[in-house]
A protein has these predicted regions:
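Long, compositionally biased non-active-site segments enriched in small/hydrophobic residues and glycine
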Residues: 7-192
Length: 192
């Protein structure tokens, strides 16, 4: 289990800790540590967790901010402040995913000139999607789809989506129904 921790103290120090109980796995065993492992291999059995010193953590990044929106720990503080995945063993099995919410938070925090209360509220309540991962795959597929009649109308409605889920666009409901399963499959490593 992972409880990603963000904290600030009275002195204004900020920190991000990938507060996971990561199994202490053998480095020399080949396995997909991010997936479901077979139960018939004794070399996959582990005993105990890695030391706290080995898990990703960040204190007082130069960006001046940290965030968490179910993102990988390598995108928590901005381009020049983020941890590098190369600094951590792949055996740790740390996820390498971004949710749309994490992509948007990262983008908006990185672009903000001032992170005051108003800016943070705009970022928190942002309803825009990034054309990345499952959204990009779906839209690229729609653009290639040859269709006629009602199917063409539905395709064109989707392609005209304003890429926000604010319940104001004509395509919002259909789009969100369409991307829901793609989003779930992507997050659960079931996307093909």
């Amino acid at each position: 289990a992972v409880a990603k921790l963000r904290a600030q103290n009275e002195a204004g120090n900020i920190a991000y800790v990938y507060n996971a109980a990561i199994p202490d796995r053998p480095e020399d065993v080949r396995a997909n540590w991010r997936g479901v492992l077979p139960g018939d291999r004794s070399d996959l059995i582990w005993d105990g967790a890695v030391d706290y010193a080995e898990i990703p953590k960040l204190v007082n990044p130069d960006s001046g901010w940290i965030y968490n929106a179910n993102n990988e720990p390598f995108t928590a503080a901005g381009e020049d402040s983020d941890l590098s995945p190369e600094d951590f063993s792949p055996v740790l099995g740390i996820e390498r995913k971004q949710t749309n919410r994490s992509r948007r938070a990262y983008k908006l925090l990185s672009e903000a000139e001032l992170l005051d209360r108003a800016a943070l509220e705009r970022i928190k309540y942002d309803m825009t999607y990034e054309r990345a991962n499952y959204v990009a795959v779906l839209w690229d597929s729609l653009e290639r789809l040859e269709a006629e009649g009602e199917l063409a109308q539905a395709r064109d409605l989707l392609l005209g989506w304003d890429i926000t889920a604010d319940n104001e666009g004509a395509a919002d409901a259909l789009t969100l129904l369409m991307i829901r399963d793609w989003m779930s499959a992507e997050y659960q490593n079931k996307a093909e």
